């Protein structure tokens, strides 16, 4: 009985973790000056509201420049990254 409860609890925790990571947005880990090319170290995934660029698309914006300064812990929005197009 205990193993069935633990298995069910593990399943619920995995589902919640999957849902939360799916709704993460890209957030700046540091101040990013205007016209700076983005690197992975400059960004992290975080659940925020309003949502910005999905964390799952972070690899698409690495190497692209920001068109304005981005503050530390600010959510990267699509209009902040030059030539960014959302995945379909």
UniProtKB/Swiss-Prot annotation:
Residues 1-23 form the signal peptide. The keyword Flavoprotein does not apply. Keywords: Antifreeze protein, Secreted, Signal. InterPro entries: AFP_Neu5c_C, AFP_Neu5c_C_sf, Antifreeze_III, SAF. GO terms for cellular component: extracellular region. The record marks 30, 35, 39, 65 as: Important for ice-binding. Pfam families: SAF. Residues 25-84 form the AFP-like domain. It is found in: Secreted. Belongs to the type-III AFP family. Contributes to protect fish blood from freezing at subzero sea water temperatures. Lowers the blood freezing point. Binds to nascent ice crystals and prevents further growth. This is Type-3 ice-structuring protein 1.9. It comes from Anarhichas lupus.
């Amino acid at each position: 009985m205990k193993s069935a409860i633990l298995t069910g609890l593990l399943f619920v925790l995995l589902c919640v973790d999957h849902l939360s990571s799916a709704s993460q947005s890209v957030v700046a880990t540091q101040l990013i000056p205007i016209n700076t090319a983005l690197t992975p170290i400059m960004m992290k995934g975080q659940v925020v509201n309003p949502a910005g660029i999905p964390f799952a698309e972070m690899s698409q914006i690495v190497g692209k420049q920001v068109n304005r300064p981005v503050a530390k812990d600010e959510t990267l929005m699509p209009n902040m990254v030059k030539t960014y197009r959302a995945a379909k």
